Design a protein with these regions (language model features):
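Outer-membrane beta-barrel "beta-signal"
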Residues: 377, 416-430
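Extracellular loop and loop/strand-boundary signature of outer-membrane beta-barrel proteins
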Residues: 47-50, 125-129, 156-160, 171-175, ...
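Short sequence motifs at beta-strands and strand-loop junctions characteristic
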Residues: 35, 52-56, 127-135, 147, ...
Length: 430
């Protein structure tokens, strides 16, 4: 369930609703929106693969959008992705072979009638479950319309299901234009409900890995709000400022993550299931800009995020769309991300220390920097059609990768991630 990388933000539905409103008001202040438009269909096939034979994802996407006139718009998206490959389980490399069981197993000791699938990691290698495979189906449906003069309402829902995780969410947002439609204020909310039913059962947090103590299905709730302002700065410049706040409560632990327990020398002495707090508050401030630069359009944004787990982050994202011919464009893309580690993040747990109440070795909670560099090429074909190809490289570099303990010296405890993204897209109106 939570082994997939990267996970979408929990407030994605809220962001989509609010941004859609912002874009349909200030960004369209000088357009006529009372005329019905054709159906717009966008399809894409995304392929993501991590180096060294880790996770790979194949994801077809279909989006349908229809403007019925008078700014009454329906927008629906369907995603079906398949993930497979090897996924790190949270333990660190060791000088000796290590044996683990896949999550659906019931024991580390094979015996008659037992549902057990074991895998052994050779010395010096990062423990990864080679049996990881998951399919996810997700859909979003949103509707937006005017409410009174210079105001808009948007609302929608989201459903997602996979073998061990189900999610349902609703969102709504309102916006109002003023200052001759050069300024738009927006506010919205999002409510999400998730069910977690891990393969083999949800482990009791912080318990001994070898005991296989499991409990029933778990749930979590996420509630969020967003407020924003969009301003037409000039004929060529549109700026947007958003503040978001969301609170998660319930089962926030990853049921498939463990931690290594080591002695004073760094030798492996066992494993513990991870344990996370049962609540999390996250806040972010976003500043976005779209600037027309002759035959090019610059999209530059900065986001500052923080939460009560101690994870503080900075994101700079830039796209530059360049018209290289009448019917062709190039769009270079650079994204830089940095975050601090969660307060309870540990590469491993020392046997001599008191067992922490909260602990996780999930690399997504570690301190790291991530960089995405790529380019998108698009060409108009046929009548109102467009074909596009996107190529990107992603690299994640952890800050903490080594240990001074004797048995762990020279081992790469958190090697990071390198991945390639290829996406082919098609857009057509009819």
């Amino acid at each position: 369930m939570q082994l997939k990388r990267p996970n979408p933000p929990l407030q994605l539905g809220l962001m989509a609703a609010s941004c859609a409103l912002l874009g349909s008001t200030a960004a369209q202040a000088q357009t006529v929106a009372d005329k019905a438009l054709p159906w717009q269909v966008e399809t894409a096939l995304l392929y993501y693969k991590e180096n060294a034979g880790l996770l790979q994802t194949i994801e077809p996407i279909v989006n349908l959008k229809k403007d019925f006139g008078d700014q009454r718009v329906v927008d629906g998206t369907f995603i079906l992705d398949t993930m497979s490959g090897a996924s790190p389980n949270g333990a660190i490399p060791s000088r000796k072979p290590q044996t683990f069981a896949s999550p659906s197993s019931t024991s580390l000791t094979p015996r008659a009638g037992a549902k057990t699938k074991l895998y052994t990691i050779t010395p010096g290698n990062l423990p990864e479950d080679p049996h990881f495979k998951e399919q996810r189906a997700a859909g979003d449906l949103d509707w937006s319309q005017p409410i009174g003069i210079d105001s808009n309402l948007s609302y929608g829902g989201h459903l997602s299901t996979e073998h061990d995780f189900n999610s349902a969410a609703v969102n709504a947002a309102v916006s109002h234009d003023f200052n001759n439609k050069n300024t738009t204020l927006s506010a919205g909310f999002n409510e999400e409900y998730d069910q977690i039913h891990a393969r083999g059962g949800n482990p009791v947090p912080a318990t001994d890995y070898t005991l296989y103590e499991k409990e029933g299905n778990q749930t979590k709730n996420v509630a969020g709000v967003l407020v924003g302002v969009t301003q037409v700065m000039s004929r060529n410049w549109l700026a947007q400022l958003n503040y978001s706040y969301d609170r998660s409560q319930g089962y926030l632990t990853d049921p498939y993550r463990i931690l290594s327990v080591v002695d004073a020398s760094g030798a492996e002495m066992g494993y513990r299931y991870e344990s996370r707090p049962d609540s999390r508050v996250r806040q972010s401030l976003y500043l976005g800009n779209k600037v027309a630069l002759g035959p090019a359009v610059l999209d530059l944004s900065y986001r500052r995020g923080k939460d009560d787990w101690g994870v503080n982050s900075d994101t700079v994202d830039t796209h530059l769309r360049i018209d290289v011919a009448r019917d062709m464009y190039l769009e270079p893309h650079v994204r830089w991300y940095r975050q601090s580690a969660a307060d309870f993040y540990h590469l491993y747990v020392n046997q001599a220390d008191p067992l922490p109440t909260d602990m996780s070795a999930d690399p997504r909670l570690a301190a790291f920097t991530g960089t995405t560099i790529g380019v998108k090429f698009g060409v108009k074909v046929a009548h109102s059609g467009e074909l596009s190809l996107r190529l990107e490289e992603y690299q994640q570099k952890p800050t903490d990768r080594s240990s001074p303990l004797t048995e762990l010296q020279g081992l790469d405890l958190n090697p990071g991630i390198k991945g390639t993204i290829v996406q082919i897209g098609w857009r057509q109106e009819f």
